Curated annotation (Swiss-Prot):
Cytoplasmic-facing ranges: 1-13, 100-118, 169-198, 243-259, 305-320, 385-401
Pfam families in the record: Sulf_transp (PF04143)
Residue intervals on the Periplasmic side: 35-78, 142-145, 220-221, 281-283, 342-363
This protein's encoding gene: yedE
Name used for this protein in its record: Probable transporter YedE
Keyword terms: Cell inner membrane, Cell membrane, Membrane, Transmembrane, Transmembrane helix, Transport
Subcellular location: Cell inner membrane
Chain ranges passing through the membrane: 14-34, 79-99, 119-141, 146-168, 199-219, 222-242, 260-280, 284-304, 321-341, 364-384
Major subcellular site: membrane
Similarity annotation: Belongs to the TsuA/YedE (TC 9.B.102) family.
Membrane topology: Multi-pass membrane protein
Cellular component GO terms, alphabetical: plasma membrane
Phylogenetic lineage: Bacteria, Pseudomonadati, Pseudomonadota, Gammaproteobacteria, Enterobacterales
InterPro entries assigned to the protein according to its UniProt record, in alphabetical order: Sulf_transp_TsuA/YedE, YedE-like
Amino acid sequence: MSWQHFKQTWLIKFWAPAPAVIAAGILSTYYFGITGTFWAVTGEFTRWGGQILQLFGVHAEQWGYYKLIHLEGTPLTRIDGMMILGMFGGCFAAALWANNVKLRMPRSRIRIVQAVAGGIIAGFGARLAMGCNLAAFFTGIPQFSLHAWFFALATAIGSWFGARFTLLPIFRIPVKMQKVSAASPLTQKPDQARRRFRLGMLVFIGMIGWALLTAMHQPKLGLAMLFGVGFGLLIERAQICFTSAFRDLWISGRAHMAKAIIFGMAVSAIGIFSYVQLGVAPKIMWAGPNAVIGGLLFGFGIVLAGGCETGWMYRAVEGQVHYWWVGLGNVIGSTILAYYWDDFAPALATSWDKVNLLNTFGPLGGLLVTYLLLFTALMLIIGWEKRFFRRAGLTPAKESV
């Protein structure tokens, strides 16, 4: 394989979602085994909100939620912080390789309102449920935590309401029509593309170098950044967004991303099971109303905002300003939840059991139940897709894998 062929195929063209999501599932499994924690982002965003408040004299470290998730240190001294920095770096490098970085402003003020409001709702819901589309879903279900199943189902329902809500006339922005005599060809500036590709390589090499230097003295932090770079490359090149997985189901009937997510969790689950059998403790959260309410809010919020936690991250570094607002909303929403946590927690979360399916059904039973539930979810998705297209008189498009 020549360099130019490799460059075009793997560094410039978008990747098929299914193998990329499966790769993310495998990578998240090794991340858990090596660092002892799961791939998650909103917990760290919540810490960012708390530390911003500290700069203004607010003693956020005294709040119950920050005692729970630990506000100590900085992003440079926390595993989650270094992993997220690696994700941003990986996303940015991948976007530069493909010359996919351009400052794009929101087309109307209503889009900014959507971004901030949706981000706040999603951030609040995610932290109420102790995780977003990662910790309470994609990496939560393979941890065999019952709360992740509650969250996943509630997120699907919330996203349905979000999809219906965003179709209201208030969110329809006017489209300016311009008369033309011929189609404009899509063009790229070769010199700009080459410069950005080189810059992307510098960013990539810089992130890898930073991670390796850190690993020499603090192995887990350095490895967390390396994993983050890998996660960032995957989500940007394959455009992995859980919002589109849910929204596309309800609006267009497309289920390709949703099925890919199921496959990714199925691959991850057996790996997590192996680590748990070797003695690594799984991350189990409260299976209470917090998971259901949080999932409903999160599902609604991500569709309103137009992006989930992974989706807004890669789109933000591509220059889509709309998603800067979504990210800001996420931090605000999660920080608001942290402020009110002590009021909500006893009734909605901490008085409920943390249910580990491996303990409830036994190791093999818990694994079997998880795969049965994943298979059921896959069948429901396939059934919905067929029903949607049958009612529309269409045939589902075959997508590359």
